[in-house]
Amino acid sequence: WDGKKLSNLWVVPGYHSAKVDSPFEFDADIYGLEAGYDVQLNPYHKLGLFVSYRQGEYDFSGKGDDYYAKTGGSIDIDSYLAGLYHRYDTQIKGRSAWLMSSLYGGWQKADLKSDDGVKADTDGLEYGAALEAGVVFMPATDVMVEPTVGVRYVHIDFDTVRDGLGKTARYDDVSETELEFGVKAEKTFEYGDGYAKLFVKPSVVQTFGDGDVRITSLGSVSGLEDMTLGRVIVGGSMDFTKQLNGFADVGYTFGGDYRDL
């Protein structure tokens, strides 16, 4: 930061592919687009806002830990979110450190369909928050090692679902808390008037899920399970001009009955 007020506009397309075996067996493909704008107010504070759209396709086999359905089904979910984020940079014993926080809210629209043609739909209010902190170590001028710790929380309140045959599914308020500890290693390359960076970040993730589903004639069914997962993210960035920068990453989350690319 050179003392002048700086602004930044960014756009990020995204894709996730997940396979889950418990408590219900399903595959998911999620496409999304996020965009944001932030302002560097001074050397310590950056404030921004963002919007997000995601479209998820979830295919259920009908198999589960406690229940089995003769036919499978699918759920298509459209998610619309908006939020604020803030980054605080400081020094701790001569080392750079930062704290990143965000708040967001929005809604989800879900269309459900079984393989034998029964349909239903519902809407849900979604909100969440995230907090992450890191400390920067520089073993060399072009190498950075950054331990990080983060916590994320999401809460979704779906309306009662009623299908064409009169069956209902009433959701508790569904929530999930995620704790993550990781270490990011980054290498910087200088070329011309710009820089390119490559990084890898392995981490351990612990999730805590809450919320059941009450289905006509079946009673209460658990919706989310607690999981201990591993995660590896590989990515990089490159300066194209003094005003334009590109970045990309690929992540893989795994553990037990869960895999997400």
Q: What are the language-model segments listed below?
A:
Residues K4-L261:
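Membrane translocator/pore-forming domains, dominated by Gram-negative outer-membrane beta-barrels
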